[in-house]
Design a protein with these regions (language model features):
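Glycine-rich phosphate-binding loop of ATP-dependent small-molecule kinases
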Residues: 1-148
């Protein structure tokens, strides 16, 4: 199984599609945002400044993102494929990702771009809500995703 990279604007459904692919093909869904949150939650000394950067609206450096990704991709569960959500975000990350693939002896990835009209994207972002009890994400503007 090849690995899959999902690229799309915010609220286009990367997470939703990744979850469906993950369940169907039994490959892990890797989100760079989740990797960062995990490091912050573990109070890892090496990544102690991450929360401050995020709080100040500063993008996390490519070096840190690539280091976290390389660590995650070296796990055994990625050897048969994985889904990358929200990565790469720039050309440098794409080139470095190719090097990581070679270094870890992983297959090349299939890239899927999810298109979304800007008006719909804005409506999805503004209507996005998280259930405080079950943590399910839904949208108050779209009936198919509203809570039952």
């Amino acid at each position: 199984m090849k690995s899959i990279i999902l690229i799309a604007p915010p609220a286009a459904g990367k997470g939703t599609q990744s979850s469906l692919i993950e369940k169907t093909y039994h490959i892990p869904h890797i989100s760079t945002s989740d990797l960062i949150r995990k490091m912050i939650s573990e109070n890892n000394e090496k990544y102690g400044e991450l929360q401050k950067s995020l709080d100040n609206g500063i993008l996390i450096s490519d070096d840190i993102i690539l280091e976290l990704l390389k660590i995650r991709l070296s796990n055994k569960d990625c050897s048969n494929g994985y889904i990358l959500d929200g990565f790469p975000r720039n050309i440098n990350q794409a080139y470095c990702y190719e090097e990581i693939l070679k270094e870890l002896n992983l297959n090349e990835s299939i890239v899927i771009y999810l298109s979304l009209d800007k008006t719909i994207a804005e409506k999805r972002v503004l209507g996005r809500m998280v259930c405080p009890n079950c943590k399910s994400v839904y949208n108050k503007y779209f009936i198919e995703t509203s809570p039952k």
